[in-house]
Regions:
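Zinc-dependent metallopeptidase catalytic helix centered on the HExxH motif
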Residues: 1-47
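Proteins with a high burden of low-complexity, intrinsically disordered sequence enriched in S/T/G/P/A and R
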Residues: 1-20, 53-58, 112-114, 120-127, ...
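Generic low-polarity alpha-helical segments
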Residues: 2-4, 32, 89, 183, ...
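Active-site-proximal alpha-helical
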Residues: 52-129
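Beta/coil-rich, acidic/histidine-enriched accessory regions frequently appended to metallopeptidases
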Residues: 97-208
Length: 208
């Protein structure tokens, strides 16, 4: 709201996302909670609220409204990657009708593949919270991501992600592994199964 007051309604995500800026906007809730944690950093991983919600919802789309309050951790990675003032720039330099992902890609001159690579790096760092600014506060939370898996009925040794927790676009999933003896070679093979029964099937020609 304040960005829109200062720079006009075509900035600051005061418009909604989607066609002709007709949708909603929960990103400000995410950034508001993130900003609060910059004022009270010792609470980001200890307040018993948003981190627990993050563990529950991180498979959702990055802008999904169901975790608009708990989606307040990716901002730390974005600031590590692009500077401590980046979230402020993202708000000020957004252009209607961009959503935050579209603005992020434009500001950082990223195509779709490069953006996905950056997100992948960020989520890999979240496995151990190896992110500047939160590394010390979060070290006691390493290993607390929950794996929602079940053995596939058709193949021995094959695991599937539960349909309720399949990662949506820009969501993520972390699978905790049992440790083995040092030097042991471990191999895993991943396969996306587009159109599988029990899962949403939209644009399956672009999935899998």
């Amino acid at each position: 709201y304040l960005v829109s007051c200062d720079l006009g309604i075509s900035h600051g995500f005061n418009y909604g996302y989607g066609d002709n800026a007709s949708g909603g906007n929960g990103w400000w809730e995410s950034c508001a909670n993130w900003q609060a944690y910059k004022c009270y950093p010792n609470m980001q991983f200890t307040d018993g609220e948003n981190f627990e919600g993050h563990l529950k919802f991180h498979h959702l789309n990055l802008l999904h409204e169901d975790w608009r309050y708990q989606n307040c951790f990716i901002q730390d990675y974005w600031c590590m990657k692009h500077g401590s003032d980046f979230i402020g720039r993202l708000w000020r330099e957004s252009k209607k009708p961009e959503d935050p992902v579209e603005a992020y890609k434009r500001l950082n001159k990223l195509d779709q593949a490069a953006f996905c690579d950056e997100q992948m790096e960020g989520y890999m760092r979240m496995a151990t919270w190896d992110i500047d600014g939160v590394r010390d506060q979060a070290k006691h939370r390493i290993g607390q991501h929950v794996s929602h898996l079940h053995l596939a009925a058709s193949k021995e040794g094959t695991w599937e992600v539960d349909s309720a927790y399949c990662p949506q676009n820009y969501g993520y999933s972390i699978i905790n592994l049992n440790t083995t003896a040092p030097g042991t070679i471990v191999k895993a093979y991943f396969k996306g199964i587009a159109g599988a029964k029990g899962y949403r099937a939209i644009n399956i020609d672009k999935a899998g």
